From Swiss-Prot:
Chain ranges passing through the membrane: 35-58, 72-95, 107-129, 151-174, 197-220, 275-298, 306-329
Main localisation: membrane
Protein name per the record: Beta-2 adrenergic receptor
Physiological role: Beta-adrenergic receptors mediate the catecholamine-induced activation of adenylate cyclase through the action of G proteins. The beta-2-adrenergic receptor binds epinephrine with an approximately 30-fold greater affinity than it does norepinephrine.
Length: 415
């Protein structure tokens, strides 16, 4: 987001006004510009490359095209737009110590900045709600949230984000009335984001704090449910081993099925942890900035401008973190390796997804996901009237597991 005050005048550059030698000062300034230019270029490259990789992986491999990963795609698009249309111009603003793109692009650039942050936090909020229904109502989940409904939700997120970001800025509702702000608005070379108090507080609440509170509340409920289900798994396994040891010895398949059931459940909870890391990282990166954003308009001189800009860039850097976090998922990790030609014959884009295995043979129905489609396997179920996870024989497609079992939703590729 834009810098408050005369941000382009200092922008964390070394203060050479007290240097005794002009040449030394100039050399320091040039070294600072080169160093910061390299760092900012690497940040832009990481954001763009990582999120293009995520979007391409989901688009290419059908196994990754789940409802949750549709929302992940929306999140990656917001980060990609941030890396292409926001961060480079912010870097140029800092390095050139002035704005060279005109008043129109200044406001448009600021609007895109607010749009990306708002779309990201709202998408994370939607993901939290998605996981809540997936783990608490798996029988209804697939009919409740289809891929078409997910597309509509994503569209609504971007429409709402666009209205809350572009409308107030393009209509100039954000503008402050003090003389320094008026002078900046009139100058083509000034793009410091002076705002009035009402806009700063209202936009922070609507675009960040409300979605954040919803996200934290819902995801805390999700983790409570996940913890309860893990305790149920432990109890069920203990009861199984205590009461049915002789049956297991007669039919090893039953024991293997229960172990596999628990494995699927644990993978679902690992997916929840991955999404929790994504949400936590976003919160840690952006919360300090939004706190300072409100404090700044209430007490102008309390927060140094350097701190404001630094926290703004911490938020920018968050856009490059998510692709690294997705590497926790074997699905994404294998897909990334395939796209980067680091893994030979390990993935295959096909009509029903892709297959993966440890020996590198494509097309084989092995690998940890396609095992779910074998005959006579046991699923985790929380059937009405029972407190245990019980076995169920038959062939069940992997895409339907989350509608068959209480706590084993494998429709999430962040496993």
């Amino acid at each position: 987001m834009g810098q408050p005050g005369n941000g382009s005048a200092f922008l964390l550059a070394p203060n050479g006004s007290h240097a005794p030698d002009h040449d030394v000062t100039q050399e320091r300034d040039e070294a600072w510009v080169v160093g910061m230019g390299i760092v900012m270029s690497l940040i832009v490259l990481a954001i763009v490359f990582g999120n293009v990789l995520v979007i391409t992986a989901i688009a290419k491999f059908e196994r990754l095209q789940t409802v949750t990963n549709y929302f992940i795609t929306s999140l990656a698009c917001a980060d990609l737009v941030m890396g292409l249309a926001v961060v480079p111009f912010g870097a140029a603003h800092i390095l050139m110590k002035m704005w060279t793109f005109g008043n129109f692009w200044c406001e448009f650039w600021t609007s895109i900045d607010v749009l990306c942050v708002t779309a990201s936090i709202e998408t994370l909020c939607v993901i939290a709600v998605d996981r809540y229904f997936a783990i608490t109502s798996p029988f209804k989940y697939q009919s409740l949230l289809t891929k078409n409904k997910a597309r509509v939700i994503i569209l609504m997120v971007w429409i709402v984000s666009g209205l809350t970001s572009f409308l107030p800025i393009q209509m100039h509702w954000y503008r402050a009335t003090h003389q320094e702000a008026i002078n900046c608005y009139a100058k083509e070379t000034c793009c410091d984001f002076f705002t009035n108090q009402a806009y700063a507080i209202a936009s922070s609440i609507v675009s960040f704090y409300v979605p954040l509170v919803i996200m934290v509340f819902v995801y805390s409920r999700v983790f409570q449910e996940a913890k309860r289900q893990l305790q149920k798994i432990d109890k069920s396994e203990g009861r199984f081993h205590a009461q049915n040891l002789s049956q297991v010895e007669q039919d090893g398949r039953t024991g293997h099925g229960l172990r596999r059931s628990s494995k699927f459940c644990l993978k679902e909870h690992k997916a929840l942890k991955t999404l929790g890391i994504i949400m936590g990282t976003f919160t840690l990166c952006w919360l300090p900035f939004f706190i300072v954003n409100i404090v700044h308009v209430i007490q102008d001189n309390l927060i140094p401008k350097e701190v404001y800009i630094l926290l703004n860039w911490v938020g920018y850097v968050n856009s490059g973190f998510n692709p690294l976090i997705y590497c926790r998922s074997p699905d994404f990790r294998i897909a990334f390796q395939e796209l980067l030609c680091l893994r030979r014959s390990s993935l295959k884009a096909c009509g029903n997804g892709y297959s993966s295995n440890s020996n590198g043979n494509t097309g084989e129905q092995s690998g940890y996901h396609l095992e779910q489609e074998k005959e006579n396997k046991l699923l985790c179920e929380d059937l009405p009237g029972t407190e245990d996870f019980v076995g169920h024989q038959g062939t069940v497609p992997s895409d339907n597991i989350d509608s068959q079992g209480r706590s084993c939703s494998t429709n999430d590729s962040l496993l």
